[in-house]
């Protein structure tokens, strides 16, 4: 956000340089990304007074003798401009000077006549009409008559100023304005804050009634409006034009400029509706109807749905709430009556609408971070004061203030000085802490028992508890007061990995050997990820912990599954042209015992696998799981279960020792169809996901893995082709075979066949069996007995027949 140094000085008596203030802001938690001097690139440009003029024959040039004070009283400079006269003061760039853009001025001959510099226009100094009147006139910039020759040009034309480009963090929406930063500057310097005038007086009655209603108070907690008649469009005063220009806006008209000025100064977005264009003189704040359309002020048309909040008249939408007004209700030179609007809109709604429509504005940027419910009152009062001060219209007695019914109260935090100091780890004198909090507009009521009842300003919605107060204290007191020390509880160890860390590293190395690359994603996402996986409303995974101060709504909850993050990584790879790959992530998910949370959530370590590409299949993930089982000396069983985000016929649940570990399989077709990737990618891509409870997996591991010596006797191999019902799972057959004989050491599926000769609803599955005895060689008779028993068990339990 851009904040002019000169504008800050209107609210605070600043007695430090811009560079010193930059350092102080940084020490208090505000990152100044850039301190921009307005006179950057300008040197040795001074006020010059034209004392002689002579037309240079045969050319368009005029030879001037210029008085530049201490730099010389008779400097000869030629110019091609024609708008100056004898006695005018103009900017003179002397020999050796520089101008914006790296332009260097040197003495040279022009049409055979020596010229020792250049007389400048406003544009050559980087000025425009809003920054300094006359800057865009064709010709030289004519300076005020009382300008002193030889004076540096910067203070004369207002270039002796700086712009602070400040990065505002998500938890400080109150600082999205010049006044918000001024509050902080006042606290930093210990100076009083001079609030802008907000008084006004209604001077007439409305000429006709207006209806204002809010149908969606959950999305619009407060809506204020005031009717102004007899609008007088005109030009804004120079000071307002300069404020806007320094922040990167051009002046349009006095009334439009007032709305923009209020946004920049107070941080309160506002809009003005031309009542002559509002059907039925009705304003209705409601959800959009499916398929409704609006054309915004920038002449873009959008099709809306009930997820969008709109301002409507009696017939149609006239504004996208919190984003931009409609072209059908904007003011023009014929406007005579306006309804000024200031409101608080739900930031989630504004953000989602802005993203969905691809429509951003200065207003939406502020609403997305949050505008407190007291702000509309201040913003509207300031705008009405300016309307009256600039004589832009007649303020009527008709005003509206519609709320969701919640009282507007300051937050109270009961704490003690010891608690605050305990968080900081240092001792700060009580009175010092009180002074700091009061400078930041908190009130501190010291109780009889020594505790403090601290109330936060209405605009500080980020302050919730005493650690927040501790943060306010230390950023003003100074982080340099905190002396680095070792943690009292820190234990000195010899280093090395513990058992759990070794097991994790073992699993990761095994997966890497299987061709999987490790992914690392954020621990946050949004509820939209659950919708992406088609999770039902009652699914346990939806019981996610919400972040109080999220960076954005896309990162507003703690993850309860890794699969959404893995799927997003796969989609991102596909979008960037990576058509195949294998990925894994081992990270915690955060599970609350109840919501809202009352104790620390369980951080369950989880393993997620992802494979994508035309050549990948179900057995890619299953093979990795089998390798994992072998690595830890385990045996996995697979059962058919339904998972919302997996294909019902190409997925399975994983069990070990009767304990459910997780699921894996192919991404459900309907989810694959909704992915934001090209259609040809959807048709050719195979996306497989798996998610396992790593903690449950490790609970099945019985201490360190013990290895057995290889048997000196070769195993006996047998192949079985079995005909079974389509519903019989491969895992069921494998489990039955293993349990039928102790000689079975390995069962592998190597073929599946379906054909009309098998009968309807039948399939053939072929398995390779290894039969071995560690103490002796298995005879042919023993092998036949084992196979006979296996076939008997398969027929009895599963109805399988030998093919």
Predicted regions and their residues:
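Phosphate-backbone binding interfaces of nucleic-acid-interacting proteins
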Residues: 1-202, 206, 339, 358, ...
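A carboxyl-terminal module marker
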Residues: 2, 20, 27, 438-442, ...
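Glycine/proline-enriched, intrinsically flexible loops and inter-domain linkers
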Residues: 5, 23, 53-55, 189, ...
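Beta-rich nucleic-acid/ligand-interaction surfaces
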Residues: 39-43, 200-202, 491-492, 496, ...
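Terminal amphipathic helices with adjacent charged low-complexity linkers/tails
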Residues: 185, 189-214, 391-420
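Extended, well-folded interaction surfaces typified by the phenylalanyl-tRNA synthetase beta subunit core
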Residues: 413-579, 718, 770-774, 782-803
